[in-house]
């Protein structure tokens, strides 16, 4: 903020030092043009200047602006710039806190599902059976209890909305809650009578709405952060449970099928729902998805052996991206994009960690998974490390991806990737 204010004063000073000739306002070499350009950058004025539109660099945007379609070019450029820096070595698994999960939460097992980064810099581990929402300070690696919850799978996942507020996705609970991460206050939004296992995670869309991913419910519900109201999309989903939602720069949410067989697509600008004809087979075959800057949505297996991606730049063509080595059941739950350009599916019962190259889809087998039913979800840290959300694993772990680059705060917090 101080930097922008200083720059603004400098621009004003320059404008008063010019000779007042406005005939060359559109001459790119003129002082008037440069001053106007700098001023527009400081105040984030995106209107056209002499036929050109100012694009604010991704790292100068707020995270609430990164998922607006008009800003995708800058976000893509920033992410790909970090990708190009590559890795410094082989990944390592690190136990970053000596306390056990059971000691911290009081929950014997299946503590968390999902994690988010908040604007205060902390990692928020979202509850499954844990009676607490736990925060991790990435600098000190210390933990705190942010809020108390019933801890009976009331929620599965959550979404970071505007102003640092996390919206928890109701699963067995009929109440919609939000957590203000500025003061860790948990607030009841409203209650609605719903069936069991209602929703799995959510997505913060460019229209300001939090869309909840249907699980037991077929109705796509949303919370409008601008109006403070709960609403629903007219067209329901069908065919079974969806495990995850993926946002694209076109403002579309792709619901990843779990027991359902087809991907359903919600256009958040029209709130119309369409499907991709390709069958993923249901049977809990798939569990997660993630968007990559080349326009792909990688679909992460749960019980299936094949990894697919949806090419959103080629009419949503579904492409076979490879096979999981020694595939089993209940393999992964969640996936994280790292600054080295690799995807890291989060192992649940799979024997190892793996990585998938987002450019050529190469699958690499990494270190052993130290437990079973281990983790569900994770989130990227400031140095490219992934904080794992412990499910039955009784320890606090991070995966050091050895990324040379890093994502700035606005990208790390972006609704494209900071979700479950």
Positions of the model-derived regions?
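Short loop/turn segments that connect beta-strands within beta-propeller blades
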Residues: 96-99, 137-141, 180-184, 224-228, ...
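Surface loop/turn motifs at the tips and blade-to-blade linkers of beta-strand repeat domains
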Residues: 65-67, 104-108, 147-151, 190-194, ...
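Blade-level signature of beta-propeller repeat domains, shared across WD40, Kelch, NHL, RCC1
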Residues: 376-420
């Amino acid at each position: 903020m101080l930097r922008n204010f200083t720059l603004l004063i400098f621009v004003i000073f320059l404008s008063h030092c010019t000779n007042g000739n406005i005939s060359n306002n559109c001459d790119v070499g003129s002082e008037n043009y440069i001053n106007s350009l700098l001023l527009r950058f400081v105040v984030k004025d995106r209107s056209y200047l002499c036929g050109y539109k100012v694009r604010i660099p991704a790292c100068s945007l707020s995270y609430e602006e990164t998922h607006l379609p008009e800003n995708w070019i800058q976000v893509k450029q920033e992410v790909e710039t970090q990708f190009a820096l590559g890795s410094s070595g082989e990944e390592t698994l690190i136990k970053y806190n000596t306390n056990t999960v059971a000691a911290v939460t009081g929950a014997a097992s299946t503590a968390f599902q999902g994690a988010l980064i908040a604007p205060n810099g902390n990692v928020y581990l979202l509850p499954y059976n844990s009676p607490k929402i736990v925060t991790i300070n990435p600098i000190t690696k210390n933990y705190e209890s942010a809020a108390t919850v019933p801890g009976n799978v009331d929620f599965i996942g959550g979404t970071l909305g505007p102003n640092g507020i996390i919206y928890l996705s109701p699963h067995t609970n009929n109440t919609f809650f939000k957590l203000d991460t500025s003061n860790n206050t948990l607030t009841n939004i409203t209650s609605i009578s719903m069936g069991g296992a209602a929703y799995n995670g959510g997505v913060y869309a460019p229209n300001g709405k939090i869309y909840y991913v249907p699980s037991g419910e077929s109705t796509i519900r949303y919370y409008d952060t601008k109006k403070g109201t709960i609403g629903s999309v007219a067209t329901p989903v069908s065919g079974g449970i969806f495990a995850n939602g993926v946002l694209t720069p076109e403002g579309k949410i792709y619901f990843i099928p779990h027991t359902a067989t087809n991907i359903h697509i919600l256009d958040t600008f029209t709130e119309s729902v369409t499907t991709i004809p390709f069958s993923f087979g249901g049977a809990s075959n798939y569990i997660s998805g993630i968007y990559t800057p080349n326009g792909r949505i990688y679909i992460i297996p749960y019980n299936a052996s094949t990894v697919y991606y949806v090419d959103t730049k080629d009419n949503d063509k579904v492409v076979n991206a490879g096979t999981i080595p020694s595939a089993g059941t209940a393999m992964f739950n969640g996936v994280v994009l790292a600054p080295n350009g690799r995807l890291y599916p989060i192992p649940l019962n799979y024997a190892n960690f793996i990585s998938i190259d987002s450019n050529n889809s190469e699958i690499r087998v990494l270190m052993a998974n130290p437990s079973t039913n281990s983790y569900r979800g994770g989130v990227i840290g400031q140095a490219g490390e992934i904080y794992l959300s412990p499910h039955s694993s009784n320890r606090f772990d991070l995966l050091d991806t050895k990324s040379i680059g890093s994502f700035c705060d606005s990208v790390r917090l972006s609704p494209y990737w900071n979700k479950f």
